[in-house]
Amino acid sequence: MTVTIEIAVDIPCPAWTEAMPDAEARCGRLAAIALGAVDLPDGVVELSIVLADDATVQGLNRDWRGKDQPTNVLSFASLDDEDAPVVPGAPLLLGDVILAFETCAAEAHDQGKTLADHFSHLVVHGVLHLLGYDHMDDEEAAEMEALETTLLAALGIDDPYGEQ
């Protein structure tokens, strides 16, 4: 058997495609690259990526994390380490990654990066969260950042943490 990756991309905020006409295709490529960094079980693996605006992300951040402010990317993992598909052969539902346009665009500008490069980093970052990576302590952060940097370097994108 093999792994089939299904990525649903929803773009309710048209500013994304105005700024990056290839945003939808880019999401698919980036998610596949991040998913390729881990051993996935045979079968179908599904996730969604939503390219939203700040207001949408602020509402989600407030409702789910208790933080009433927008953020660049949110990840909502569907599974924890003990979860498995309920029905044998059912798709493995990883979860959702949601990005906020205004925050991402402002960060890219402030950091002297292209929106495409910053977007690439945040999609990879969000998908890695769905796979169980986190940055709650220094050790976890170092592992996650090293993997992000490696994956992005393969795309010709500079280390997003290099100037921090």
UniProtKB/Swiss-Prot annotation:
InterPro entries: MetalPrtase_cat_dom_sf_prd, YbeY, YbeY_CS
Name of one Pfam family that matches: YbeY
Cofactors: Zn(2+)
Enzyme class: hydrolase
Cofactor: record remark: Binds 1 zinc ion.
Main location: cytoplasm
SUPFAM superfamilies: Metalloproteases ('zincins'), catalytic domain (SSF55486)
GO molecular-function terms, A-Z: metalloendopeptidase activity; RNA endonuclease activity; zinc ion binding
Keywords noted in UniProt: Cytoplasm, Endonuclease, Hydrolase, Metal-binding, Nuclease, Ribosome biogenesis, rRNA processing, Zinc
GO BP annotation list: rRNA processing
Subcellular location: Cytoplasm
Recorded GO CC terms: cytoplasm
Record-listed E.C. numbers: 3.1.-.-
Binding site for Zn(2+): 125, 129, 135
Function description: Single strand-specific metallo-endoribonuclease involved in late-stage 70S ribosome quality control and in maturation of the 3' terminus of the 16S rRNA.
Family: Belongs to the endoribonuclease YbeY family.
Name the UniProt record assigns to this protein: Endoribonuclease YbeY
The organism's taxonomic lineage, starting at the top: Bacteria, Pseudomonadati, Pseudomonadota, Alphaproteobacteria, Rhodospirillales
Name of encoding gene: ybeY
